[in-house]
Amino acid sequence: MKKSVRPAASKVSGERGKPEVAGNAAAGKPASKSSTAAPLSKVKSSDDLLAAMAGGNPASCNAVSKSKRTTSVGTTASTLDSKPKTASGTTSKRLASSLSKETNLTRDRLRTSRASANKKQSAAGPVGGDAASGKRSRGQTLAESEGRMSKSKSDGQISDKVALETKVKDLLGLAKSKDVEILHLRSELRDMRAQLGLGGEEPQEGAVEEEKPHVSAITAADVESTLILLQEQNQAIREELNLLKSENRMLKDRLNALGFSLEQRLDGSDKLFSYASLSPDLAAGSGQSDGGGTGTLASSVEGSAPGSLEDLLTGHQHGGSADNLDSESSEVYQAVTSSDDALDAPSGASSSSESECAPSRERSRRGSSGNASEVSVACLTERIHQMEENQHSTAEELQATLQELADLQQITQELNGENERLGEEKVILMDSLCQQSDKLELYGRQIEYLRSLLDEHHVSYVLEEDIKSGRYMELEQRYADLAENGRFEREQLLGVQQHLSNTLKMAEQDNAEAQEMIGALKERNHQMERIMESERQGRAAVEATLEEYKEVASSDQAELSRCRAQLEQERQRVAELYSLHTAGDKNDICQLLEGVRLGKEEAEAKAAKLQEGLEQAHGELSHLRETFSKLDREYREFQEQAQQQMGEQERALEKQRLDLQEKETEVADMKETIFELEDEVEQHRALKLHDNLIITDLENSVKKLQDQKHDMEREIKILHRRLREESMEWRQFQADLQTAVVIANDIKSEAQEEIGDLRRRLQEAQEKNEKLSKELEEVKSRKQDEERGRVYNYMNAVERDLAALRQGMGLSRRSSTSSEPSPTVKTLIKSFDSASQGPPSSGASVTPTASAAPLPRTPLSPSPMKTPPAAAVSPIQRHSVSGSMSAAKPLSSLGDKRPTYPDISLPAEHLLRGSAAGRPPSALQRVSNMDSTKAISVSRRSSEEMKRDMAAPDGASSASLMAMSAASSPLALASSSPTASVTPTTRSRLREERKDPLSALAREYGGSKRNALLKWCQKKTEGYQNIDITNFSSSWNDGLAFCAVLHTYLPAHIPYQELTSQEKRRNFTLAFQAAESVGIKCTLDINEMVHTERPDWQSVMTYVTAIYKYFET
């Protein structure tokens, strides 16, 4: 899952920003022909590369290229005179660092150039719109401006794409020119090595060698001056590295204060980016420090070239944190160096580790902002990765929990069914108990009656012993218990009946209260209806009054119209009179006018009166209308209130009806329950009568069983006698076997002493080797050429001695395996006695070298108890051993299966073989002298205690012998059977664990079975590198977790120190083959596991469960 992210990003950014520097790349080729101009050409080409990657602003490009050129020239000026040629590792580091350091700068400049282009495009649109606004309408102007903006955007994108393609082509040409320079420098390096008289060829990785002309030989004076300059430069670089280390510590403290930690595990991409960002100056300094340590230019190149950046990265990918970077990089450096520069490896390793730990000069000049941003991105990436892992682990745990809940629900259903069945059986037993109690009371009365008769007739009687027997007491106790249970259940039933009666009474009370409430609501409804009726009557009276007033108003209107008609007539008459007055006699006319005026006054007075009456009638009419509208509004409001109250009363009534119906149904159900209980009582009485007959039959059968019991007791006594005889034979056999174990312990102690001597010799040789290497380092600065040959000769001699020592140990192991005793106990004892008394032969003296004392438990050491049978015995032999060792059954089963001496000889032979060949040599080499001496003293004390116990009288029991043998050595633990002291409860628990092996693990660790198995795996893989088990999917995708778990049991099958997380197929193949070798069937597909990043967690958990079941249950 850990894939390289930063290299890919740098590659993409490198492809985006491509300059037009084909001329500079072409100029780099002729510049590399001369030896003095080669570093300068590299500096120029790297500056061109930086300028090309910047690509955006020409002014900034020139400024950056000038600063880069001055920095590179200033840092490498001291090396131009003394070191005319540079190794391929330095060039590759220079190129990788320059590419990685300029990645972020290129991205920023591309973004700024695009932002400026977008601003120009956005500014061009409104200007064009303003120029065309005077000629066209607003709609046409907007359409044209949008079209121009889209066209300018598309043109800008096309131009950016073309520029990027040209930059990509230029960078490809520049990379090819760099490859040519690297090949040229490598050929010059070979020529220099040939001139200095050093053999061997420089290892190359995928590069084609080109033939170059030889350069003239360098004189000894030039070499000495070069060495002196290199030593001075090495000293200066070391001082600068110390300063940078202190600055690095300060930056780490600042990062820790900000909340970021460098000790978190980074992805491979982050590691690659951080390593690739080392400056070319420090890479050159690393090569110079190597040269200062060895004394020649060629040796410095030879010491730094194999430990290139790629080798260091591949070696560090297995590391745990950034703190152990120095040790891991030095180990990788020593591993990849050739045999010719073996003496230069320590100095090269130290300088390369220092160059890796220290940040570059460029990065220190840029400040801590770039480091903080890179570390923050790395930390965020790691946190996101951890969050994804936690999410998947949580989902996996939830699925496992749901499965376990489903299983528990199924078990609960089964237990409920079992509980119901037991309840039914209990009811039947209660009925039978009641019948038996009644019968017992009847029999008791009969017995009392018969005793009274015997007392009256003075007849002596004696109770039979059977009545006083244990069965009688048992039956009496059972009767008391059943009577107590019957009383308790009877009280429960009475309580239930009382509860039902109380519930019925409460329901009746609630019903009565509901009826009373219903009556009150009905009465209130009638009252509201009466009020509504009275209101209706009042409204009818008001309407009648209103009709009367309307009639009066209509009569007044008719009178007013009549008066108006008369007024019109009088006016006509007045007009006639005026006409007569003008034509006739004035006196008559005056009289008539006077009469008419009087009539007019009377008519006007009458009209005024009628007008006042009309106005008064109108006022009364309006008042009546207002009163009527007010009464109408009040009536409507009252009607609405009455309807609302009626609706509420109807709803309350409906609710009370529903409650009443529910109460009635409850009462009916209670009555039905009472009827059913009465029926059940009748049925139980009938069953009681039937069970009485069954009890009589059972009593008859009990008598027959008692007779059979007496017969079985006699047979048991006979079997006990046989058992005593066979136990005596078994004790004798155990004594013989203990004697063999004691002799084996003595031989084992002698072998451990010899192993201690060999280890002391080996340690002395190693100390001597270290002293001589230190002396070699001191003398090497004065006489380098002469001392190199001597040291090589000495190292070869030491290696030959060590190879001869290992070969002798291997021959001793083979001779020990070939000189095995015959597979019988008597011949074993005779051979052990002869070996302890007589002088030891060559095979016998070498045999104990392969047996190891109880070793301290380390992550890569085998399991102390289960390794010898599993690692050195085939599956068929293992099952035969376990089958024959389980012959020590409980004493009750020895009457059928009696072990003989030939049956036990095979386990003894395999036990001795396991003690002699179970431990691999690697495990022996990891044990210190102190541990071996302690183990020897413990084995001696245990053998002496065994001899004293064997001298004790023969009355000791077999259990004590088994305890002493278990204390003497682990072999006796394997030979003694653990089933002799197993109780029935533990035996049932063992059967349960075999059926479900994770149940015991869940009880031990707590929580679910999945989490318990996960904790067990974590505990087993403690101390193993690159193992972090948090789930059953992604934590197992590289096969290392399987190998680590199986390595704790089968260390001989899995070379864990040689495994890597990249070789997934090999890891899975080794793990599955090791598991199949002991009988664990493989249920996983290797192809699917290799190609799947997150395998099916249920399949993985099933396979891990099979491993746990095989080795732990």
Swiss-Prot record:
Pfam families: CH. One of its GO terms (cellular component) is spindle. InterPro entries: CH_dom (IPR001715), CH_dom_sf (IPR036872), F-actin_Monoox_Mical (IPR050540). GO terms for biological process: cell division; face morphogenesis. PROSITE patterns: CH. Residues 145-154, 941-951 have a biased composition (Basic and acidic residues). It is found in: Cytoplasm, Cytoskeleton; Cytoplasm, Cytoskeleton, Spindle; Cell junction, Gap junction. Residues 338-358, 834-845, 972-981 have a biased composition (Low complexity). Residues 59-103, 925-940 have a biased composition (Polar residues). Residues 220-259, 379-433, 473-791 form a coiled coil. Residues 856-867 have a biased composition (Pro residues). Belongs to the cytospin-A family. May interact with both microtubules and actin cytoskeleton. This is Cytospin-A.
